[in-house]
Each structure stands twice: as C-alpha cells, then as structure tokens.
Curated annotation (Swiss-Prot):
Pfam families: Macro
Name under which the protein is recorded: ADP-ribose 1''-phosphate phosphatase
Annotated binding of substrate, by residue: 13-15, 28-30, 35-40, 140-146
An example Gene Ontology CC term for this record: nucleoplasm
A GO MF label: ADP-ribosyl-[dinitrogen reductase] hydrolase activity
Catalytic activity: ADP-alpha-D-ribose 1''-phosphate + H2O = ADP-D-ribose + phosphate
EC code: 3.1.3.84
Matches recorded under PANTHER family: ADP-RIBOSE GLYCOHYDROLASE OARD1, PROTEIN C6ORF130
Primary enzyme class: hydrolase
Domain of life where this protein originates: Eukaryota
C-alpha cells in the first residue's frame, strides 16, 4: 500500500516486478545511448527492443547530443520475458554519465522539461495508456546522476503528472 504526496505515490518494491501492465515506466537517461549500469541496465535487460530504439534515437543526434536534453522518448515495447505491453519513457536529463554527468541543477531543470514533454505525448494517446495514466519510476536521478531526491521530487510535484515511485531499501 502506498502513500500519496501531491502527484506522487510511494511504494516499497521492484519497479519491474510490481508495476501494472500495460504501464508507462520512466527513467532518467543520458543522451549518448548508454544503458550500461544502474536502473538503466535493468531496463536494457527487461526491454532489449526499447534499448535498440533508444540507442538509434541517440545516434541520430550524434552531432549534438545535447539537443535531446529536456525531451522524452516514449517507446512502445514488450517485456522480454512475459510479452506484456510496456511504454518506456526515456527522460533525457543529462548529456553524459559517470564522472562527466551534468550538474544537479541542470539535471533537475531538464527533468522538468522532459516530464512536461512526456505529459504532452500521453495527452495525445488513447486506450489503456493516455493523459491520465500514472507514470511508474524509480527515484530518478538519485542514483548514478547523484541528484538529491528532494530536488527531483519537487519538480515532479510541480509538473503534476501522477507518478508511482518504487523504493527499494
């Protein structure tokens, strides 16, 4: 059972195992086409087709990967094990990753823009996924991007898209 704080609901559990289907599963992404570690590696394993689309999308911007910042790539895919329908929302919040990750203030700014872009895309959809759909995510930016969760939480609340945040502690 979760608790509600503005647009956010928190639940204890694994995003991949406990989110409903169909669902929108979001995570913060770099703009270079790498899902090599952290939760991104889990997305790559569960949704290999989505990774191929994400990588192809990033490669189109190889001359200026920063053009992806503040956008969301919404990919329709299927769970590699169950075949269930999932939409993977790639929130482009940092150009780079690792030691060269963008600064926290920049990442938070891009998170707000990317979530607003996701909202616009969902508003155009109908069926089981639409503008009223809840977005399911881990504590984005708080891991390898090293952004304090309270900063990301604040912009998610400002955007107002219903989100369920999965916490594993």
């Amino acid at each position: 059972m979760g608790y509600r704080l503005s647009a956010l609901t928190y639940v204890q559990g694994d995003l991949f195992e406990e989110s409903p289907r169909p669902a929108v599963l979001a995570h913060a992404c770099n703009c270079l086409g790498s899902w090599g570690s952290g939760v991104a590696a889990g997305f790559k394993q569960k949704f290999p087709g989505a990774f191929v689309e994400y990588k192809r999308h990033c490669d189109k911007y190889s001359d200026d990967n920063s053009a992806l910042l503040g956008t969301c790539q919404l990919i329709e895919t299927h769970d590699a094990q169950t075949g269930e329908l999932v939409y993977v929302a790639c929130l482009f919040t940092s150009v780079r990753f690792g030691a060269r990750v963008d600064g926290p203030e920049q990442i938070v700014k891009q998170t707000k823009l990317a979530m607003q872009d996701l909202q616009k895309q969902l508003a155009k959809m109908s069926g089981p996924i639409d503008g009223n759909s809840t977005v399911h995510m881990p504590k984005i930016n708080a891991g390898l991007f090293r952004v304090p969760w309270r900063d990301t939480e604040k912009v998610l609340e400002e955007v107002g898209q219903p989100c369920t945040v999965y916490v594993i502690d």
